[in-house]
Design a protein with these regions (language model features):
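Glycine- and Gly-Pro-enriched alpha-helical subdomains that act as flexible
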Residues: 115-118, 141
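Conserved C-terminal guanine-recognition region of P-loop GTPase G domains, centered on the G4
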Residues: 124-194
């Protein structure tokens, strides 16, 4: 009888802890981000559990700057004027159940064919088989959206049934009218089946909108 009561109490405590996690605002969750692992091949992937959100984009699309702004860090994800710096899957742990995953930048012409094929295979395998993956944030430079690889990646994600959110970065480089033109162009190209927003790591434009998307995927509170 006592063991049954102890078991019930443990179950209640576990449920309360889980409820507390879901009540935590997304901003607090992402601010806890810590680098945990770099993956060069499938055998190095961590256990397929919890909730993961991946961030993908062409080399020099502003992907690392987006992650740093989102997590309120200056150098959580390495930024560089040299494209192609992210050469593996980089895992950032948010809490014991949630992770943000920075995928290798694609489309860098100076990368050898063999390495490019390896990256593409690693990305494809991760997106295709990862049960913990709740959604994909695809990053594009608002001035040059829908370049080689962008549409292919978006279509691959949608075919897999993966929730897709497109973020057009460096929006501070364009006026409002040009921004809206870019949003319409990208949304139309994908048939309106993915959500699209503008974003600036410099000014913070679009940060709250991105947080709302991530809150839904990570199953926590917005704000």
């Amino acid at each position: 009888m006592i063991s049954e009561i102890d078991g019930a109490e443990s179950d209640i405590i576990a449920r309360l802890r889980q409820l507390k996690k879901t009540m935590t605002p997304i901003r607090h969750i992402v601010e806890q981000a810590e680098y945990t692992l770099s993956v060069h091949n499938r055998s190095q992937l961590p256990p397929d559990a919890g909730i993961e959100v991946a961030v993908a984009g062409r080399s020099n699309s502003g992907k690392s700057s987006l992650i740093n702004r989102l997590c309120r860090r200056k150098a959580l994800a390495r930024t560089s004027r040299t494209p192609g710096r992210t050469q593996q899957l980089v895992f950032f742990q948010l809490d014991d159940e949630r992770s943000l995953v920075d995928l290798p930048g694609y489309g860098y012409a100076k990368v050898g064919a063999e390495l490019r094929k390896h990256w593409e295979g690693l990305i494809q395998n991760y997106l295709e088989s990862r049960a913990a993956l709740a959604g994909l944030v695809q990053v594009m430079d608002i001035r040059h959206p829908l370049k080689d690889g962008d549409i292919q990646l978006a279509e691959f994600a949608l075919h897999r049934g993966l929730p897709l959110h497109l973020v057009l970065t460096k929006a501070d480089k364009l006026g409002h009218g040009k921004r809206m033109e870019a949003v319409h162009k990208v949304r139309s190209a994908l048939g309106g089946v993915a959500t699209v927003q503008v974003f600036s790591a410099t000014t913070g434009l679009g940060l709250e909108e991105l947080e709302h998307v991530l809150a839904a995927w990570f199953q926590v509170m917005p704000g």
